[in-house]
């Protein structure tokens, strides 16, 4: 799908999708899972070739940030959620050529939706492709800040459940949610680092107007301020995970201790029963009238005595 936007009164205005001849007026062309026909339209009409989705997965810096005859290229990760609402990252290709921004992605992304909604009312100061690019990055950082706040709130709730130490369904659910928070934080960290590298490359390779240069530096400062917060969440996740494992180990040790003490407690009684269960021909107690009650009494005494001792020691 091709989404094309042109400038009208310093605002982004969406162009008619059916009228592809208007693409020459576009300042921003956003492609979402473009078909081969749509790629050919761009190639024939604007002489612009697009990266393949396989190239978007490359993580080497030389493959993600470079400049060639087709323009300035940036590949950047955007935070999103998959079909099962788990944290995910989508790689977006940005290309700036002849004053026009091309974006290529394989799915709809929250940051793009939010920016398109804002662009209906937001005026552009410099009215160029670099401003659209920086605004998209700025929207992405705002989204990441919201994700960090969400993780923080969830960890506050989980900490009360885990540090309470009472194992049960709520405790098990908290462990599962904790792993999801760790995954979210790791993806936010990767996204922040990737955006930082992309903006640093952009500042080095282009001569941005003063306003946009300051905007880029402001975004970089926002990233630097968010990174310590995200790292502190990582540390809190690790602390809660270690605390949860500690409580689980304590509970397992308590169970093993109980069974160990119980087995030792009944060992003397088992010894008495084994003694009188032997099949020797001459056993005086077998002819004793009260031999059976005596054996039962010995077994009870052999069991009760260790129990009372262990109880006094606090082992039970």
Curated annotation (Swiss-Prot):
CDD domains given for it? EcCorA-like_1
Question: Reaction catalysed by this chain?
Answer: Mg(2+)(in) = Mg(2+)(out)
Spell out the coiled coil positions from the record.
none
Per the record, where is site Essential for ion permeation?
253
| Entry similarity comment | Belongs to the CorA metal ion transporter (MIT) (TC 1.A.35) family.
Task: Reproduce the free-text note on domains from the UniProt record.
Answer: The central ion permeation pathway is formed by the first transmembrane domain from each of the five subunits. Mg(2+) binding strengthens interactions between subunits and leads to the formation of a symmetrical homopentamer surrounding a closed ion permeation pathway. Low Mg(2+) concentrations trigger both a conformation change within each subunit and a loosening of the interactions between subunits. This results in an open ion conduction pathway. In addition, this results in a less symmetrical shape of the whole complex.
- What protein name applies here? Magnesium transport protein CorA
**Organism lineage string:** Bacteria, Pseudomonadati, Pseudomonadota, Gammaproteobacteria, Pasteurellales
């Amino acid at each position: 799908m091709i989404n094309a936007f042109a400038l009208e009164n310093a605002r982004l205005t969406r162009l008619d999708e059916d009228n592809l001849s208007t693409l020459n007026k576009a300042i921003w062309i956003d492609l979402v899972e473009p078909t081969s026909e749509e790629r050919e339209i761009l190639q024939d009409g604007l002489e612009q070739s697009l990266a393949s989705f396989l190239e978007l997965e490359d993580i080497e810096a030389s493959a993600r940030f470079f400049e060639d005859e087709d323009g300035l290229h940036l590949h950047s990760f955007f935070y999103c959620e998959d079909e099962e609402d788990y944290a995910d990252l989508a790689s977006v290709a940005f290309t700036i050529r002849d004053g026009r921004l091309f974006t290529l992605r394989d799915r709809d992304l929250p940051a793009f939706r939010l920016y398109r909604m804002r662009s209906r009312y937001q005026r552009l100061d410099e009215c160029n492709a670099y401003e659209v690019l920086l605004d998209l990055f700025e929207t992405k950082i705002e989204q990441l800040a919201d994700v960090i706040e969400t993780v923080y709130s969830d960890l506050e709730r989980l900490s009360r459940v885990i540090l309470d130490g009472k194992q049960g369904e709520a405790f098990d659910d908290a462990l599962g949610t904790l792993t999801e928070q760790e995954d979210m934080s790791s993806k936010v960290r990767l996204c922040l680092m990737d955006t930082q590298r992309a903006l640093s490359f952009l500042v080095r390779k282009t001569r941005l107007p003063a306003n946009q240069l300051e905007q880029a530096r402001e975004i970089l400062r926002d990233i630097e301020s968010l990174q310590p917060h995200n790292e502190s969440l990582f540390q809190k996740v690790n602390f809660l995970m270690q605390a949860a494992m500690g409580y689980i180990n304590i509970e397992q040790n308590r169970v093993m201790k109980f069974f160990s003490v119980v087995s030792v407690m009944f060992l003397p009684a088992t010894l008495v029963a084994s003694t009188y269960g032997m099949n020797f021909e001459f056993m005086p107690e077998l002819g004793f009238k009260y031999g059976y009650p005596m054996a039962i009494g010995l077994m009870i005494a052999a069991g009760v005595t260790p129990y009372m001792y262990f109880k006094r020691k606090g082992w039970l």
